[in-house]
């Protein structure tokens, strides 16, 4: 399948006006316009995921994050390796967080939540969180276990009340700011799930009386990238889609 056709398909999945207004939140870097037979996806663009793409002869990488400028030299290294091996790359940051098939929405649905509200507004445009409800309330340790099974990693959790958990705010990835937690509190949620925390996250959750669950940034967000890649597979059945291995290092 021609890369340009895959690019058109992917871009059509997002709000065009938001993409135009925030070009810093996404990119599609084409290495020519040859055929693409294999797509690899990961949360992060790192030397390790690029190496996985090279090893598996991937023609297009899809990630949630670009390589970070503040990890000095890493972005240049990744760009050089992609160019060297003729691998195209696209990333969608806030647009994927905002999408109904994106990071927080997909994690919420995977946990069995019925989404009832959007939350966690960023840049006055992108709703990066989702509030959902369980059909039947669950206990604290039950939710923690479900999240650990889903993410395949330990989940840190802080219990601030003894009520069963019915209503949950999910802000996958970097929802560590106290204003993110406040969105969950203002949304009358019993629990808040995210992928990063600081002292302030924990202290405010305790003060506000909301149960806090923290997985990793990488693996709370992978389900949205997986959904994006699956949509490419649905559109182009002949394309092979694979998950690129990422380590649990957080």
Spans of model-derived segments:
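Hydrophobic structural segments
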Residues: 1-250
């Amino acid at each position: 399948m021609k890369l340009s056709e895959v690019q058109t398909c992917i871009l059509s999945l997002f709000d065009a006006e938001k993409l135009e207004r925030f070009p810093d939140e996404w990119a599609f870097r084409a290495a020519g316009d040859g055929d693409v037979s294999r797509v690899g996806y990961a949360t992060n663009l790192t030397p390790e995921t690029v190496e996985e793409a090279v090893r598996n002869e991937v023609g297009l990488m899809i990630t949630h994050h670009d390589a970070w400028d503040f990890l000095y030299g890493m972005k240049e290294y990744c760009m050089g390796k992609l160019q060297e091996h003729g691998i195209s790359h696209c990333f969608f940051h806030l647009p994927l967080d905002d999408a109904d098939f994106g990071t927080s929405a997909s994690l919420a649905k995977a946990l069995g939540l019925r989404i009832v509200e959007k939350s966690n507004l960023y840049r006055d445009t992108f709703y990066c969180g989702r509030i959902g409800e369980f059909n039947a309330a669950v206990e604290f340790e039950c939710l923690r276990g479900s999240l650990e099974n889903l993410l395949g990693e330990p989940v840190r959790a802080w219990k601030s009340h003894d009520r069963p958990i019915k209503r949950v705010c999910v802000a996958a990835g970097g929802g560590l700011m106290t204003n993110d937690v406040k969105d969950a509190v203002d949304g009358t949620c019993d629990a808040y799930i995210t992928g990063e925390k600081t002292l302030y996250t924990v202290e405010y959750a305790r003060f506000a009386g909301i149960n806090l669950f923290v997985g990793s940034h990488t693996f709370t967000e992978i389900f949205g990238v997986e959904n994006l890649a699956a949509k490419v597979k649905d559109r182009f059945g002949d394309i092979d889609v694979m998950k690129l291995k990422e380590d649990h290092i957080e």
